[in-house]
Amino acid sequence: MEAPRGNLRAVALIAGDNNVRGCLQFVQDISGTTHVTGKISGLSPGFHGFHIHSFGDTTNGCISTGPHFNPLNRVHGPPNEEERHAGDLGNILAGSNGVAEILIKDKHIPLSGQYSILGRAVVVHADPDDLGKGGHKLSKSTGNAGSRVGCGIIGLQSSADAKL
């Protein structure tokens, strides 16, 4: 999986419960869209909520990453709609081998500017994200995606280190 060429690059090393591990690369292209690529292993097969959370703090595991990144104070929603948290990236799918291959393009998670995601955390949840449409009391805030099974801090990457 080759990420597009761009000026800004970031990386997140994912760690968590039950040997959940991964490496994600973030590349902001010249149009401002951020491309997220990589793999996460150790997941249960099926869909898992996938979000950018507000804080790059893992001192208390993934719980200390705070809520979804939401600088515009919107309700939770699917990644293809404007009414959503900036950090709402929907779901990733882990195959029967427990590996999810990530290939996401999103204009709401820039690596620069006022709403940059640098220094924040990416989080994988135990359950599917209902995209704000599940009718559960947590649907409009978390997508009712369950516990946090893995996370990593999004850090600026040197262009010399871009080949992971």
Curated annotation (Swiss-Prot):
It comes from the Eukaryota. Its EC number is 1.15.1.1. Its cofactor is Cu cation; Zn(2+). Its main location: other. It is found in: Peroxisome. Induction: Upon photosynthetically active radiation (PAR) (e.g. light fluence) increase or after high-light pulse, and UV-B treatment. Accumulates in response to ozone fumigation, during recovery. Repressed by salt stress. This is Superoxide dismutase [Cu-Zn] 3. The gene is CSD3.
